[in-house]
C-alpha cells in the first residue's frame, strides 16, 4: 500500500480521521436504528447541500459547482458494477473520502457506524432500488458482464504497455481529455441534468473517486454515469489496465493527496508574549499546519492550501494564516473588481454544526479580514487608482476636492452621525473612526451572516502581502464582551475552520475556498 503524503509543515501534527485511499471496509447491514442514526446525521451535515428530501436543492446548493447529487434520482457517478449502480462500499467510500473536484468534503472523522447509517439512509431516498446482479464476466465476443466488475491482478507497466496505452488514449480518451491529458479536448459538455461539465485535467491529480489503481480500473471500465464519460469499449483486462497505469502516471501521489480534505489537530502552544505582526519572530514557536482548501464553485486554478499557526498567552489567542496568491487584490473600486480576504470560523459547541457557516439554531463565530479594509486604513483609495487618466470635477464651494482629503473619511467626520445613516445606525463598515481591518461576525447557516454590535467588535487583524503571498494575523481575548462570540480557555479543544477569497478569480460572499472542521488544541 502506498503511504499517503501528508501536507504538513515542520514540527508535529496529528492527522484526525486519515486518508481512506485503498482501505478495505466491512459493511454494516441496515437496521432501523442505523438508518435513523444516518437520518439525523444527514439532516445536520448533508441537507444544507443535498436538500431535506435529497433532491440536491439544499439552501447552499446555489453556491456550489458541480451541483449536489440528487439522491432521489440515484444516478451516482462513482460505481463499480456493470449495471452502473453503486455498491454500499462505493457509497461508503464517497462519504468517507469526499469528491475532490467538487464541494463534497470528506467525512472520515465521523464514526464508521454513522457513515454506514448515512449509506442506508441515502439509499432509502431513491425512487428505485439500487440493484445489481451476481458477478459474471463479459462474454468473449464482447459486451458487458453483471455485478461487481472483477479486477484482475495488475500487470507490469513496461515500455510496450506504455506504447499500447498511449495508442488507446489517443483513440478513446484524447477527444475529451486532450492529447496530453490536460482536459483541453471537447470542453463544451453537459451532464444528464443539463448542467455544464468539462473533462478532467488528468495531470492535476484531482480524482472524484478513490485514486487507487483498482478503483481507477473500474471507473475506466464502468464510466461515470450521468456524465459524458461513457462505459469503456476496451476489453477488461490488459487494455483497461494499460489505460489505468497510463492515466495514473500523468500525476503524482502527492498531487492526488493534496486534493483530499483532511482533518488535523492544530497544536497551540502557550507563550509569554503574543506576536502582533505576521513577521514577528514569536511565530517560530508555533508548528505550521498546511490545510487543503476546496473552492465551493470549483476551479482547477485554485488556492490549494492555507498554512495555519496559532499561539496563546492564557488570556488571548493569535492565529496566523499564510497562503499563496499571485495577485494583490486590495481595492474594489470598479464593479468587476473583488477583494482578497480570509476568515477563521469557530463552532460554539464541541459537536460542530454544518461546516458551511453553521446551521439554524447552531451558531458559528467568524473572524474576517478584508484586504480593501486594510488598504483604506493606509491611504484613501480613490478611483484615480483604477483610472489614472480620468477627469475630476472640483467645485469652489466644497470644503475640499477628493484629492485634497487628508484621509478617507475626512468629510464624513465633519458631519453629524444622525445624518450619515450607516454611521448613525452603528454599522461597523460605515464607521469613519474604524481603525481595524477585522470584523467579528455570527451566522446560523447561509443568508444569516450578521456583524456583532460595534461595542462587541474585539477581533483585531493585520495582513501583509509580500512575495506573492498573504500573511494575516487575527487576535482576540479568550472571553468576549458579548454573548455570541466563542469562549476560549487554556486546555480547551475548539472546532475551527478557515476560508480564503481570491478576488482576481471573482471570489466574493459565498464564492470562496474553504477547509473542513479542524481541531484547535489550546495548551494548558
Predicted regions and their residues:
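Extracytoplasmic electron-transfer domains, predominantly the class I c-type cytochrome c fold
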Residues: 63-108, 115-125, 189-247, 339
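Short, well-ordered beta-strand segments enriched in hydrophobic/aromatic residues
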Residues: 316-323, 470-478
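Short amphipathic, basic-aromatic surface patches that mediate peripheral association
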Residues: 325-332, 482-484
Amino acid at each position: 500500500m502506498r503511504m499517503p503524503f501528508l501536507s504538513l509543515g515542520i514540527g508535529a501534527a496529528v492527522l484526525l480521521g486519515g486518508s481512506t485511499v485503498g482501505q478495505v471496509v466491512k459493511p454494516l447491514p441496515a437496521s432501523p436504528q442505523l438508518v435513523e442514526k444516518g437520518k439525523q446525521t444527514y439532516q445536520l451535515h448533508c441537507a444544507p447541500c443535498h436538500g431535506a428530501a435529497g433532491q440536491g436543492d439544499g439552501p447552499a446548493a446555489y453556491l456550489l459547482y458541480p451541483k449536489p447529487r440528487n439522491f432521489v434520482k440515484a444516478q451516482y457517478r462513482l460505481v463499480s458494477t456493470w449495471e452502473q449502480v453503486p455498491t454500499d462500499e462505493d457509497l461508503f467510500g464517497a462519504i468517507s473520502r469526499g469528491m475532490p473536484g467538487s464541494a463534497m468534503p470528506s467525512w472520515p472523522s465521523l464514526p464508521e457506524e454513522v457513515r454506514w447509517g448515512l449509506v442506508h439512509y441515502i439509499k432509502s431516498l431513491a425512487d428505485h432500488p439500487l440493484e445489481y446482479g451476481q458477478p459474471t464476466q463479459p462474454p468473449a465476443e464482447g459486451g458487458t458482464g453483471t455485478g461487481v466488475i472483477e479486477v484482475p491482478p495488475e500487470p507490469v507497466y513496461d515500455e510496450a504497455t506504455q506504447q499500447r496505452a498511449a495508442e488507446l488514449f489517443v483513440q478513446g480518451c484524447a477527444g475529451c481529455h486532450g492529447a496530453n491529458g490536460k482536459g483541453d479536448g471537447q470542453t463544451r459538455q453537459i451532464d444528464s441534468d443539463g448542467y455544464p461539465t468539462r473533462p478532467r485535467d488528468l495531470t492535476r491529480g484531482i480524482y472524484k473517486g478513490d485514486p487507487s489503481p483498482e478503483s481507477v480500473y473500474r471507473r475506466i471500465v464502468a464510466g461515470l454515469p450521468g456524465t459524458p464519460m461513457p462505459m469503456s469499449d476496451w476489453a477488461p483486462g490488459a487494455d483497461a489496465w494499460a489505460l489505468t497505469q497510463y492515466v495514473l502516471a500523468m500525476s503524482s501521489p502527492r498531487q492526488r493527496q493534496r486534493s483530499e480534505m483532511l482533518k488535523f489537530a492544530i497544536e497551540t502552544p502557550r507563550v509569554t508574549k503574543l506576536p502582533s505582526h505576521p513577521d514577528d519572530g514569536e511565530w517560530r514557536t508555533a508548528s505550521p499546519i498546511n490545510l487543503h482548501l476546496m473552492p465551493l464553485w470549483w476551479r482547477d486554478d485554485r488556492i490549494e492550501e492555507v498554512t495555519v499557526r496559532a499561539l496563546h498567552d492564557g488570556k488571548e489567542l493569535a492565529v496566523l494564516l499564510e497562503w499563496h496568491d499571485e495577485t494583490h487584490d486590495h481595492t474594489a473600486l470598479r464593479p468587476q473588481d473583488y477583494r482578497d480576504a480570509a476568515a477563521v470560523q469557530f463552532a460554539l459547541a464541541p459537536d460542530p454544526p454544518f461546516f458551511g457557516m453553521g446551521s439554524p439554531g447552531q451558531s458559528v463565530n467568524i473572524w474576517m479580514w478584508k484586504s480593501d479594509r486594510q488598504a483604506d486604513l493606509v491611504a484613501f483609495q480613490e478611483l484615480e487608482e483604477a483610472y489614472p487618466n480620468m477627469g475630476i470635477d472640483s467645485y469652489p464651494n466644497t470644503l475640499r476636492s477628493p484629492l485634497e482629503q487628508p484621509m478617507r473619511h475626512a468629510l464624513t467626520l465633519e458631519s453629524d452621525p444622525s445624518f450619515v445613516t450607516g454611521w448613525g445606525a452603528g454599522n461597523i463598515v460605515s464607521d469613519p473612526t474604524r481603525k481595524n481591518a477585522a470584523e467579528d461576525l455570527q451566522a446560523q447557516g447561509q443568508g444569516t451572516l450578521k456583524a456583532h454590535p460595534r461595542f462587541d467588535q474585539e477581533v483585531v487583524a493585520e495582513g501583509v502581502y509580500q512575495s506573492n503571498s498573504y500573511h494575516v494575523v487575527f487576535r482576540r481575548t479568550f472571553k468576549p464582551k458579548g454573548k455570541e462570540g466563542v469562549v476560549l480557555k487554556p486546555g480547551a479543544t475548539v472546532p475551527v475552520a478557515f476560508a480564503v477569497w481570491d478576488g482576481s478569480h471573482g471570489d466574493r460572499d459565498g464564492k470562496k475556498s474553504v477547509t473542513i472542521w479542524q481541531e484547535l488544541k489550546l495548551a494548558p
